[in-house]
């Protein structure tokens, strides 16, 4: 999508081999409502999940504001039909890895149509253990060697599932925790982007959005390292499809659940030319990347300007 600071060769290749959507929108500018919309095809007002799960409820609101936040459902109802349940009923093997954030235990991926769950729990970020590095402290993801990187682990789990189900239809949903806070990158990647930042002469520049600062330049080395690690993980999964000869018969979709974090929690990225970011209903909060590759069905290198949304 044109960044000159972040490096994403796997995603760039995916765009060249499929369609790049320029007007794709999340159902909500925060995570849980959009994730529920992806799983169900329903808008947030239909699922009742209208804020991120864990957000303050009206009775717990402590800020002096004119309005209270609206109440919301804190889990995806089990009687709501999910994409995983539909595909499982159609004979697909179903697999989930990464961030779930759609309810407490009993409402996790294995309760919503997924045969296997690697890392999907109630948390919105990797807040247990050493977070983005093993030991993870995640009850649905066994610890790897000390220092193992979470995006790489989730990609390898996904690749292993694909290989073991190569001879039957499968639905593999890899929902990275990246690039959610906490901001943590591999040291080699952080150093790479610190050097790139210096070489390009980039410095932090700021604007204002209401009462908050907003970052105007992409130059945050840790965030850039997180983006590249995610891209490397995407490449791992795509390479597995190629190794197994499954590229031609596999639909690949890459998207996100809200805009980049530009106005809080470290202000790590910029969404310019779009206004604001995650948490805001401006373009910066809801316009998303969307890449679709389906050989023989989707024209390689095509660009789609038609507006689409996550329930689609």
Language-model features: locations:
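Short phosphate-binding/catalytic loops that engage adenosine nucleotides
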Residues: 19, 91-92, 246
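His/Cys-centered metal/cofactor-coordination and adjacent catalytic loops
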Residues: 45-83, 137-138
């Amino acid at each position: 999508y044109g960044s000159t600071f972040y490096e994403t060769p796997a995603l760039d290749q995916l765009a060249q081999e499929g369609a790049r959507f320029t007007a794709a929108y999340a159902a909500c500018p925060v995570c849980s409502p959009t994730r529920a919309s992806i799983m169900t095809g329903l808008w947030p007002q239909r699922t009742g999940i209208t804020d991120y799960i864990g957000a303050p409820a009206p009775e717990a609101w402590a800020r002096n504001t004119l309005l209270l936040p609206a109440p919301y459902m804190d889990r995806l109802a089990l009687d709501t039909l999910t994409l995983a349940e539909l595909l499982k009923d159609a004979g697909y093997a179903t697999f989930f890895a990464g961030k779930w954030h759609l309810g407490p235990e009993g409402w996790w991926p294995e309760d919503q149509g997924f045969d296997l769950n690697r890392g999907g729990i109630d948390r919105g970020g990797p807040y247990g253990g050493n977070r983005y590095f093993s030991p993870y402290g995640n009850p649905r993801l066994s610890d790897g060697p000390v220092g193992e990187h979470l995006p790489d682990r989730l990609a390898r789990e996904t690749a292993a599932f694909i290989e073991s189900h190569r001879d039957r239809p499968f639905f593999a949903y890899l929902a990275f925790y990246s690039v959610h806070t906490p901001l943590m990158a591999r040291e080699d990647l952080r150093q790479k982007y610190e050097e790139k930042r210096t070489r390009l002469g980039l410095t932090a520049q700021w604007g204002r959005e209401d009462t908050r600062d907003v970052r105007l330049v992409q130059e945050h080395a840790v965030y850039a390292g997180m983006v590249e690690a995610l891209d490397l993980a995407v490449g791992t999964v795509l390479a597995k499809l190629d190794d197994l000869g499954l590229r031609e018969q596999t639909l690949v979709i890459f998207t996100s659940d809200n805009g980049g974090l530009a106005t809080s929690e470290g202000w790590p990225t910029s969404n310019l030319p779009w206004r604001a970011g995650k948490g805001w209903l401006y373009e910066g909060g809801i316009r998303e990347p969307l890449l679709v590759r389906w050989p023989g069905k989707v024209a390689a290198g095509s660009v789609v300007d038609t507006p689409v949304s996550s329930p689609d």
